[in-house]
Each structure stands twice: as C-alpha cells, then as structure tokens.
Amino acid sequence: MKVRASVKKMCEKCRVIRRHGRVMVICTATQKHKQRQG
C-alpha cells in the first residue's frame, strides 16, 4: 500500500473509497495500485 498526499486512480479498475475518514484507492485488477491518503 502506498501512502500519498494525493491519491489518484491509476487504471479503470481502481475505485476511490472512504474508510474511517481516510480516502483510499482499491483496485481489483492490480494490487500495486492500492493507495491511502495521509
């Protein structure tokens, strides 16, 4: 999981969600695309 100041979708399968007040990107195709803001 990457921790970044700004999270962006890296492919069309990426989804931006909010968990516990944090913005996260989860991807069903590529696990490398997982990101968390903070």
Swiss-Prot record:
InterPro entries according to UniProt: Ribosomal_bL36 (IPR000473), Ribosomal_bL36_sp (IPR035977)
One record GO biological process: translation
Matching Pfam families: Ribosomal_L36
Similarity annotation: Belongs to the bacterial ribosomal protein bL36 family.
UniProt superkingdom: Bacteria
Protein name: Large ribosomal subunit protein bL36
GO cellular component entries: cytoplasm; ribonucleoprotein complex; ribosome
Alphabetical list of SUPFAM superfamilies matching this protein: Ribosomal protein L36
Keywords, ordered alphabetically: Ribonucleoprotein, Ribosomal protein
Alphabetized GO MF terms: structural constituent of ribosome
